[in-house]
């Protein structure tokens, strides 16, 4: 979730080295590998302090970006004990961890609130904590008629006004593939559409923050990014809207799991259950615009209208084939960097 603002790494190494020596401390703690910024603050307020502390469980946040967290999870999977009890990662990274056998299997017996998770988001080794969709976000002052199709991203009248996040190269490539007649298991047509973007002077922006700045200055009028991010920027005063195009959108799910070799597996499972509590879910919705993943988290009607998706829109969500993405990601990145960005 590199879209979230990061804070400096919170050093829990000293604490974790003490855990094996102090059995009570070990049994009353849970170490959560997570993002910082607003995400970490909301976890601290809505899960750590509101739910875990009353149970007598101290939460230590191990804050980092997703790449070092994923690397740590993979590197430690053969160890007798890992350094995290809960790992928070995006769906693609969690797929890889599951395939490598790094995660504890989950069900309603060890995480009771999994029974409230929407069926289309359920998985065997992770919980879906929050979700949104990577879709078209646009400046409502400059584009007064909402886009209807992903092909609008290639409309010559928006020459030089389409911005693309460098970090979201996979999502951008997926949109290009669909626009070119491909599918979630055939990204080959993306190459032609990417080069068309280049000829239309599409701007590649280095970070999520750079996309926000480009919207604010009106350097760009349109991008592909999480609808939740558009909501947050709109709340900050930038006139933005989002649409789920008639061809669909790329869902993005942020998940949490318990490593198989977690020191405090029981507390880790309790933490996953707490993340699915309605109050914790609605707090993320109000602050960050991400949609709850459980059926009993009820949003304010106005907020629901702004951030949620209709059943018809959900039906149009693409179904990413993570095995395909894992197989071809290096090739996609190479084309993105060498040919498209050039």
What is each PLM-predicted segment?
Residues 131-132, 192-197, 236-260:
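Periplasmic-binding protein-like
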Residues 1-17:
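N-terminal secretory signal peptides and thylakoid transit peptides that target proteins
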Residues 37-44, 67, 82-219:
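Extracytoplasmic ligand-binding site segments that recognize negatively charged/polar headgroups
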Residues 94-98, 216, 221-239:
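A ligand-binding cleft/hinge motif common to bilobed small-molecule-binding domains
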Residues 26-91:
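Early extracytoplasmic/lumenal segment of secretory-pathway proteins
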Residues 302-342:
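Extracellular/periplasmic bilobal clamshell ligand-binding domains
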Residues 135-142, 177-180, 252-265, 283:
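A bilobed periplasmic-binding-protein/Venus flytrap-type ligand-binding module shared by bacterial periplasmic
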Residues 25, 178, 259-319:
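Mature extracytoplasmic/periplasmic domains
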């Amino acid at each position: 979730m590199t879209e979230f603002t990061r804070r400096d790494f919170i050093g829990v190494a000293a604490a974790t080295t003490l855990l094996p020596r102090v059995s009570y401390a070990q049994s009353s703690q849970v170490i959560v590998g997570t993002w910082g910024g607003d995400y970490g603050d909301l976890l601290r307020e809505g899960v750590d302090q509101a739910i875990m502390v009353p149970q007598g469980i101290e939460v230590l946040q191990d804050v980092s970006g997703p790449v070092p967290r994923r690397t740590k999870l993979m590197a430690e999977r053969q160890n007798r004990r890992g350094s995290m009890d809960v790992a928070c990662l995006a769906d693609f990274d969690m797929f890889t961890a599951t395939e490598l056998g790094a995660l504890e299997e989950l069900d309603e017996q060890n995480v009771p609130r999994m029974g409230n998770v929407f069926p289309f988001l359920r998985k065997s080794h992770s919980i879906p904590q929050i979700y949104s969709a990577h879709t078209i976000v646009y400046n409502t002052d400059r584009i007064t008629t909402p886009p209807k199709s992903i092909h609008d991203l290639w409309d010559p009248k928006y020459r030089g006004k389409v911005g693309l996040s460098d970090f979201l190269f996979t999502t951008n490539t997926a949109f290009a593939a669909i626009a070119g007649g491909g599918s979630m298991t055939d990204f080959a047509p993306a190459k032609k559409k990417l080069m068309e973007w280049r000829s239309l002077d599409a701007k590649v922006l280095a970070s999520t923050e750079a996309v926000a700045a480009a919207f604010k200055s009106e350097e760009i009028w349109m991008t592909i990014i999480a609808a939740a991010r558009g909501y947050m920027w709109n709340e900050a005063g930038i006139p933005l809207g989002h649409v789920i195009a008639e061809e669909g959108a790329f869902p993005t799910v942020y998940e949490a799991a318990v490593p198989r070799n977690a020191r405090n597996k029981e507390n880790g499972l309790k933490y996953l259950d707490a993340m699915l509590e309605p109050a914790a879910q609605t707090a993320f919705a109000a602050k960050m615009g991400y949609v709850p993943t459980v059926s009993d988290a009820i949003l304010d009607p106005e907020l629901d209208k702004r951030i949620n998706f209709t059943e018809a829109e959900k039906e149009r969500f693409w179904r990413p084939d993570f095995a395909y993405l894992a197989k071809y990601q290096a090739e996609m990145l190479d084309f993105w960097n060498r040919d498209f960005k050039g």
